Curated annotation (Swiss-Prot):
Optimum pH is 7.0-9.0. It comes from Arabidopsis thaliana. Strongly inhibited by UDP. Optimum temperature is 35 degrees Celsius. Its EC number is 5.1.3.2, 5.1.3.5. The gene is UGE3. Pathway: Carbohydrate metabolism; galactose metabolism; Nucleotide-sugar biosynthesis; UDP-L-arabinose biosynthesis; UDP-L-arabinose from UDP-alpha-D-xylose: step 1/1; Cell wall biogenesis; cell wall polysaccharide biosynthesis. This is Bifunctional UDP-glucose 4-epimerase and UDP-xylose 4-epimerase 3. Disulfide bonds: none annotated.
Protein backbone atom coordinates (compact mmCIF):
# COMPACT_ATOMS: atom_id res chain seq x y z
CA UNK A 1 0.00 0.00 0.00
CA UNK A 2 2.73 2.46 0.98
CA UNK A 3 2.41 6.01 -0.22
CA UNK A 4 -0.94 5.54 -1.94
CA UNK A 5 -2.83 5.37 1.36
CA UNK A 6 -5.01 8.43 1.09
CA UNK A 7 -4.46 9.46 -2.49
CA UNK A 8 -7.74 10.56 -3.99
CA UNK A 9 -8.41 9.59 -7.61
CA UNK A 10 -11.18 10.93 -9.83
CA UNK A 11 -12.32 8.24 -12.28
CA UNK A 12 -14.44 9.49 -15.17
CA UNK A 13 -16.60 6.80 -16.77
CA UNK A 14 -15.97 4.68 -13.70
CA UNK A 15 -19.27 2.78 -14.02
CA UNK A 16 -18.25 1.34 -17.41
CA UNK A 17 -16.60 -1.95 -18.29
CA UNK A 18 -12.93 -1.04 -17.85
CA UNK A 19 -13.77 1.62 -15.25
CA UNK A 20 -15.44 -0.75 -12.77
CA UNK A 21 -12.64 -3.31 -12.97
CA UNK A 22 -10.04 -0.58 -12.45
CA UNK A 23 -11.95 0.92 -9.50
CA UNK A 24 -11.94 -2.51 -7.79
CA UNK A 25 -8.14 -2.67 -8.13
CA UNK A 26 -7.66 0.96 -7.00
CA UNK A 27 -9.71 0.40 -3.85
CA UNK A 28 -7.85 -2.84 -3.13
CA UNK A 29 -4.57 -0.91 -3.45
CA UNK A 30 -5.62 1.66 -0.84
CA UNK A 31 -6.69 4.58 -3.04
CA UNK A 32 -9.77 6.72 -2.43
CA UNK A 33 -11.95 6.87 -5.54
CA UNK A 34 -14.60 9.27 -6.80
CA UNK A 35 -16.51 8.22 -9.91
CA UNK A 36 -18.26 10.60 -12.29
CA UNK A 37 -20.37 8.90 -14.96
CA UNK A 38 -23.43 9.96 -16.98
CA UNK A 39 -24.61 6.32 -17.27
CA UNK A 40 -24.97 6.81 -21.02
CA UNK A 41 -23.52 3.35 -21.72
CA UNK A 42 -23.45 1.90 -18.20
CA UNK A 43 -25.67 1.31 -15.16
CA UNK A 44 -25.39 2.24 -11.49
CA UNK A 45 -25.91 -1.43 -10.56
CA UNK A 46 -22.31 -2.00 -11.73
CA UNK A 47 -21.10 0.40 -9.01
CA UNK A 48 -23.20 -1.42 -6.38
CA UNK A 49 -21.47 -4.65 -7.41
CA UNK A 50 -18.04 -3.01 -7.10
CA UNK A 51 -18.96 -2.14 -3.49
CA UNK A 52 -20.03 -5.72 -2.89
CA UNK A 53 -16.72 -7.05 -4.29
CA UNK A 54 -14.46 -4.82 -2.18
CA UNK A 55 -16.53 -5.14 1.00
CA UNK A 56 -17.99 -2.59 3.45
CA UNK A 57 -14.71 -1.08 4.70
CA UNK A 58 -13.23 -0.21 1.32
CA UNK A 59 -16.67 0.88 0.08
CA UNK A 60 -16.45 3.88 2.38
CA UNK A 61 -13.57 5.06 0.17
CA UNK A 62 -15.77 5.08 -2.95
CA UNK A 63 -18.07 7.92 -3.96
CA UNK A 64 -20.34 7.90 -7.03
CA UNK A 65 -21.57 11.04 -8.80
CA UNK A 66 -24.01 11.16 -11.68
CA UNK A 67 -22.61 13.83 -13.98
CA UNK A 68 -21.60 14.70 -17.52
CA UNK A 69 -18.22 16.11 -18.52
CA UNK A 70 -19.93 18.16 -21.23
CA UNK A 71 -21.46 20.15 -18.40
CA UNK A 72 -18.58 22.05 -16.78
CA UNK A 73 -20.69 22.66 -13.68
CA UNK A 74 -20.78 18.92 -12.95
CA UNK A 75 -16.95 18.77 -12.88
CA UNK A 76 -16.61 22.07 -11.02
CA UNK A 77 -18.87 20.76 -8.25
CA UNK A 78 -16.53 17.80 -7.63
CA UNK A 79 -13.29 19.80 -7.68
CA UNK A 80 -14.66 22.56 -5.46
CA UNK A 81 -15.62 19.99 -2.80
CA UNK A 82 -12.45 17.91 -2.59
CA UNK A 83 -8.85 17.70 -3.72
CA UNK A 84 -7.87 15.10 -6.32
CA UNK A 85 -4.32 13.81 -6.67
CA UNK A 86 -4.91 12.51 -10.20
CA UNK A 87 -7.60 11.72 -12.75
CA UNK A 88 -8.13 8.50 -14.70
CA UNK A 89 -10.18 9.51 -17.72
CA UNK A 90 -12.25 6.66 -19.20
CA UNK A 91 -15.41 8.58 -20.10
CA UNK A 92 -16.23 8.57 -23.80
CA UNK A 93 -18.13 6.84 -26.56
CA UNK A 94 -16.36 3.93 -28.20
CA UNK A 95 -18.34 2.33 -31.07
CA UNK A 96 -16.54 2.68 -34.39
CA UNK A 97 -19.65 2.04 -36.52
CA UNK A 98 -21.78 4.52 -34.61
CA UNK A 99 -19.05 7.15 -34.89
CA UNK A 100 -19.15 6.89 -38.69
CA UNK A 101 -22.93 7.45 -38.72
CA UNK A 102 -22.98 10.10 -36.02
CA UNK A 103 -19.61 11.86 -35.82
CA UNK A 104 -20.97 14.99 -34.12
CA UNK A 105 -22.10 12.94 -31.12
CA UNK A 106 -18.53 11.61 -30.83
CA UNK A 107 -16.89 15.01 -31.14
CA UNK A 108 -19.28 16.45 -28.55
CA UNK A 109 -18.81 13.63 -26.02
CA UNK A 110 -15.16 12.76 -26.44
CA UNK A 111 -13.60 16.12 -27.32
CA UNK A 112 -15.75 18.68 -25.48
CA UNK A 113 -15.95 16.54 -22.33
CA UNK A 114 -12.17 16.11 -22.18
CA UNK A 115 -11.42 19.79 -22.83
CA UNK A 116 -13.79 20.76 -20.00
CA UNK A 117 -12.01 18.28 -17.75
CA UNK A 118 -8.56 19.76 -18.53
CA UNK A 119 -9.85 23.30 -17.89
CA UNK A 120 -11.19 22.36 -14.47
CA UNK A 121 -8.12 20.32 -13.55
CA UNK A 122 -5.90 23.29 -14.43
CA UNK A 123 -8.05 25.66 -12.38
CA UNK A 124 -7.69 23.45 -9.30
CA UNK A 125 -4.04 22.61 -9.98
CA UNK A 126 -4.59 18.88 -10.45
CA UNK A 127 -2.18 18.15 -13.30
CA UNK A 128 -1.87 14.37 -13.46
CA UNK A 129 -3.92 12.24 -15.80
CA UNK A 130 -4.07 8.67 -17.04
CA UNK A 131 -5.95 8.80 -20.35
CA UNK A 132 -7.78 5.97 -22.14
CA UNK A 133 -6.42 6.00 -25.63
CA UNK A 134 -6.74 3.14 -28.07
CA UNK A 135 -4.90 0.99 -30.56
CA UNK A 136 -7.15 2.65 -33.17
CA UNK A 137 -4.55 5.45 -33.28
CA UNK A 138 -2.32 3.05 -35.26
CA UNK A 139 -4.93 2.88 -38.07
CA UNK A 140 -4.05 0.01 -40.40
CA UNK A 141 -0.42 -0.53 -39.43
CA UNK A 142 1.95 -1.55 -42.23
CA UNK A 143 3.95 -3.70 -39.83
CA UNK A 144 3.18 -5.41 -36.52
CA UNK A 145 3.69 -5.44 -33.61
CA UNK A 146 2.68 -1.80 -33.08
CA UNK A 147 5.39 0.22 -31.35
CA UNK A 148 4.54 3.44 -29.47
CA UNK A 149 6.64 5.66 -31.76
CA UNK A 150 4.89 4.52 -34.96
CA UNK A 151 3.35 7.25 -37.08
CA UNK A 152 -0.27 7.59 -35.99
CA UNK A 153 -3.34 7.65 -38.20
CA UNK A 154 -7.05 7.23 -37.57
CA UNK A 155 -9.51 5.42 -39.84
CA UNK A 156 -12.84 6.67 -38.44
CA UNK A 157 -14.34 9.47 -36.31
CA UNK A 158 -13.94 7.48 -33.07
CA UNK A 159 -10.26 6.87 -33.81
CA UNK A 160 -9.84 10.53 -34.75
CA UNK A 161 -11.19 11.65 -31.36
CA UNK A 162 -8.61 9.45 -29.61
CA UNK A 163 -5.80 10.66 -31.86
CA UNK A 164 -6.80 14.30 -31.42
CA UNK A 165 -7.06 13.89 -27.64
CA UNK A 166 -3.54 12.44 -27.60
CA UNK A 167 -2.34 15.49 -29.55
CA UNK A 168 -4.15 17.80 -27.12
CA UNK A 169 -2.39 16.07 -24.21
CA UNK A 170 1.00 16.51 -25.91
CA UNK A 171 0.24 20.19 -26.64
CA UNK A 172 -0.85 20.90 -23.05
CA UNK A 173 2.29 19.27 -21.69
CA UNK A 174 4.52 21.16 -24.15
CA UNK A 175 3.01 24.48 -23.07
CA UNK A 176 2.82 23.65 -19.36
CA UNK A 177 5.55 21.10 -18.56
CA UNK A 178 4.33 20.55 -15.00
CA UNK A 179 1.51 18.38 -16.42
CA UNK A 180 2.12 14.62 -16.22
CA UNK A 181 -0.05 12.60 -18.59
CA UNK A 182 0.13 8.91 -19.43
CA UNK A 183 -1.71 7.81 -22.58
CA UNK A 184 -2.68 4.14 -22.42
CA UNK A 185 -3.36 2.60 -25.82
CA UNK A 186 -5.65 -0.34 -25.17
CA UNK A 187 -5.84 -3.17 -27.60
CA UNK A 188 -8.99 -5.36 -27.28
CA UNK A 189 -10.22 -5.66 -23.68
CA UNK A 190 -12.17 -8.84 -22.89
CA UNK A 191 -12.89 -11.16 -19.97
CA UNK A 192 -14.37 -10.16 -16.63
CA UNK A 193 -13.67 -10.13 -12.89
CA UNK A 194 -13.16 -13.71 -11.68
CA UNK A 195 -16.21 -13.42 -9.39
CA UNK A 196 -18.51 -13.09 -12.40
CA UNK A 197 -20.20 -10.14 -10.65
CA UNK A 198 -19.01 -7.42 -13.06
CA UNK A 199 -18.28 -7.59 -16.78
CA UNK A 200 -19.06 -5.95 -20.09
CA UNK A 201 -22.74 -5.18 -20.63
CA UNK A 202 -23.13 -3.12 -23.81
CA UNK A 203 -26.49 -1.53 -24.59
CA UNK A 204 -27.96 -2.73 -27.91
CA UNK A 205 -26.19 -5.11 -30.32
CA UNK A 206 -22.53 -5.30 -29.29
CA UNK A 207 -19.98 -3.91 -31.74
CA UNK A 208 -17.00 -5.86 -30.45
CA UNK A 209 -16.35 -9.55 -30.61
CA UNK A 210 -16.57 -10.96 -27.08
CA UNK A 211 -19.93 -9.55 -25.93
CA UNK A 212 -21.29 -10.64 -29.32
CA UNK A 213 -20.02 -14.23 -28.89
CA UNK A 214 -21.36 -14.16 -25.33
CA UNK A 215 -24.86 -13.09 -26.43
CA UNK A 216 -24.92 -15.91 -28.99
CA UNK A 217 -23.80 -18.40 -26.32
CA UNK A 218 -26.63 -17.43 -23.93
CA UNK A 219 -29.23 -17.42 -26.72
CA UNK A 220 -29.79 -13.66 -27.01
CA UNK A 221 -28.53 -13.58 -30.62
CA UNK A 222 -28.87 -16.39 -33.19
CA UNK A 223 -25.39 -16.36 -34.71
CA UNK A 224 -22.09 -14.53 -34.82
CA UNK A 225 -21.29 -12.46 -37.90
CA UNK A 226 -17.60 -12.86 -38.74
CA UNK A 227 -16.59 -9.88 -40.87
CA UNK A 228 -13.91 -10.89 -43.35
CA UNK A 229 -12.82 -14.46 -44.05
CA UNK A 230 -10.32 -13.76 -46.82
CA UNK A 231 -7.66 -11.87 -44.88
CA UNK A 232 -4.06 -13.04 -45.44
CA UNK A 233 -3.99 -14.68 -41.97
CA UNK A 234 -3.75 -18.29 -40.76
CA UNK A 235 -7.52 -18.90 -41.11
CA UNK A 236 -8.69 -15.89 -43.16
CA UNK A 237 -10.20 -14.02 -40.19
CA UNK A 238 -8.79 -10.78 -38.76
CA UNK A 239 -6.14 -10.92 -36.02
CA UNK A 240 -6.29 -8.77 -32.88
CA UNK A 241 -4.55 -8.50 -29.52
CA UNK A 242 -7.10 -9.43 -26.86
CA UNK A 243 -6.27 -8.44 -23.30
CA UNK A 244 -7.94 -9.50 -20.05
CA UNK A 245 -9.70 -6.56 -18.42
CA UNK A 246 -8.07 -7.37 -15.05
CA UNK A 247 -4.63 -7.06 -16.68
CA UNK A 248 -5.80 -3.75 -18.11
CA UNK A 249 -7.00 -2.61 -14.68
CA UNK A 250 -3.59 -3.45 -13.19
CA UNK A 251 -2.00 -1.47 -16.03
CA UNK A 252 -3.89 1.62 -14.83
CA UNK A 253 -2.66 1.17 -11.28
CA UNK A 254 0.89 0.81 -12.64
CA UNK A 255 0.45 3.99 -14.71
CA UNK A 256 -0.84 5.89 -11.69
CA UNK A 257 2.11 4.76 -9.58
CA UNK A 258 4.41 5.91 -12.38
CA UNK A 259 2.81 9.39 -12.35
CA UNK A 260 3.35 9.64 -8.60
CA UNK A 261 6.91 8.33 -8.63
CA UNK A 262 8.54 9.64 -11.82
CA UNK A 263 8.97 13.40 -11.96
CA UNK A 264 10.21 13.20 -15.55
CA UNK A 265 7.33 11.24 -17.07
CA UNK A 266 5.99 14.21 -19.07
CA UNK A 267 3.42 13.04 -21.62
CA UNK A 268 4.09 9.42 -22.55
CA UNK A 269 2.16 6.69 -24.40
CA UNK A 270 2.15 2.99 -23.51
CA UNK A 271 0.54 0.04 -25.26
CA UNK A 272 -1.52 -2.24 -23.06
CA UNK A 273 -1.85 -5.57 -24.84
CA UNK A 274 -0.48 -9.09 -24.55
CA UNK A 275 1.79 -8.84 -27.58
CA UNK A 276 0.06 -11.92 -29.05
CA UNK A 277 -2.26 -11.84 -32.04
CA UNK A 278 -5.34 -14.10 -31.99
CA UNK A 279 -7.71 -14.55 -34.92
CA UNK A 280 -11.47 -14.12 -34.62
CA UNK A 281 -12.01 -17.82 -35.38
CA UNK A 282 -9.40 -18.88 -32.80
CA UNK A 283 -11.24 -16.76 -30.23
CA UNK A 284 -14.56 -18.40 -31.14
CA UNK A 285 -13.01 -21.84 -30.77
CA UNK A 286 -11.49 -20.95 -27.39
CA UNK A 287 -14.85 -19.61 -26.16
CA UNK A 288 -16.60 -22.80 -27.33
CA UNK A 289 -14.10 -24.79 -25.29
CA UNK A 290 -14.61 -22.64 -22.17
CA UNK A 291 -18.41 -22.61 -22.36
CA UNK A 292 -19.19 -26.02 -23.85
CA UNK A 293 -21.51 -24.17 -26.27
CA UNK A 294 -21.43 -24.26 -30.06
CA UNK A 295 -21.27 -20.75 -31.56
CA UNK A 296 -22.96 -20.69 -34.98
CA UNK A 297 -21.12 -18.30 -37.28
CA UNK A 298 -22.01 -16.52 -40.49
CA UNK A 299 -19.11 -15.47 -42.71
CA UNK A 300 -19.67 -11.91 -43.94
CA UNK A 301 -17.69 -9.51 -46.14
CA UNK A 302 -14.96 -7.40 -44.55
CA UNK A 303 -16.00 -4.16 -42.84
CA UNK A 304 -14.60 -0.97 -44.35
CA UNK A 305 -11.64 0.32 -42.36
CA UNK A 306 -10.89 -2.96 -40.57
CA UNK A 307 -7.19 -3.84 -40.51
CA UNK A 308 -5.88 -7.36 -41.17
CA UNK A 309 -3.74 -7.75 -38.05
CA UNK A 310 -3.12 -5.45 -35.10
CA UNK A 311 -1.18 -6.46 -32.01
CA UNK A 312 0.99 -4.68 -29.49
CA UNK A 313 4.65 -4.42 -28.77
CA UNK A 314 4.57 -4.55 -24.96
CA UNK A 315 8.25 -3.92 -24.18
CA UNK A 316 7.90 -0.27 -23.21
CA UNK A 317 5.16 -0.91 -20.61
CA UNK A 318 7.10 -3.90 -19.25
CA UNK A 319 10.28 -1.89 -18.90
CA UNK A 320 8.93 1.47 -17.69
CA UNK A 321 5.73 0.57 -15.85
CA UNK A 322 6.85 -2.85 -14.60
CA UNK A 323 3.60 -4.21 -15.99
CA UNK A 324 2.96 -7.32 -18.06
CA UNK A 325 -0.27 -9.10 -18.99
CA UNK A 326 -0.69 -12.31 -16.98
CA UNK A 327 -3.74 -13.91 -18.58
CA UNK A 328 -3.98 -15.86 -21.83
CA UNK A 329 -6.90 -16.38 -24.20
CA UNK A 330 -8.21 -19.44 -22.33
CA UNK A 331 -8.52 -17.49 -19.06
CA UNK A 332 -10.13 -14.58 -20.91
CA UNK A 333 -12.77 -16.92 -22.32
CA UNK A 334 -13.23 -18.73 -18.99
CA UNK A 335 -13.92 -15.46 -17.14
CA UNK A 336 -16.06 -14.06 -19.97
CA UNK A 337 -18.22 -17.20 -19.87
CA UNK A 338 -18.43 -17.15 -16.07
CA UNK A 339 -19.82 -13.59 -16.25
CA UNK A 340 -22.14 -14.42 -19.18
CA UNK A 341 -23.45 -17.61 -17.62
CA UNK A 342 -24.22 -15.91 -14.31
CA UNK A 343 -25.59 -12.74 -15.95
CA UNK A 344 -27.08 -13.69 -19.32
CA UNK A 345 -28.82 -10.30 -19.52
CA UNK A 346 -25.92 -8.32 -18.10
CA UNK A 347 -26.78 -6.22 -15.07
CA UNK A 348 -30.53 -6.44 -15.80
CA UNK A 349 -32.94 -9.17 -14.89
CA UNK A 350 -34.34 -10.90 -17.98
CA UNK A 351 -36.55 -8.31 -19.76
Amino acid sequence: MGSSVEQNILVTGGAGFIGTHTVVQLLNQGFKVTIIDNLDNSVVEAVHRVRELVGPDLSTKLEFNLGDLRNKGDIEKLFSNQRFDAVIHFAGLKAVGESVGNPRRYFDNNLVGTINLYETMAKYNCKMMVFSSSATVYGQPEIVPCVEDFELQAMNPYGRTKLFLEEIARDIHAAEPEWKIILLRYFNPVGAHESGRIGEDPKGIPNNLMPYIQQVAVGRLPELNVFGHDYPTMDGSAVRDYIHVMDLADGHVAALNKLFSDSKIGCTAYNLGTGQGTSVLEMVSSFEKASGKKIPIKLCPRRAGDATAVYASTQKAEKELGWKAKYGVDEMCRDQWNWANKNPWGFQKKP
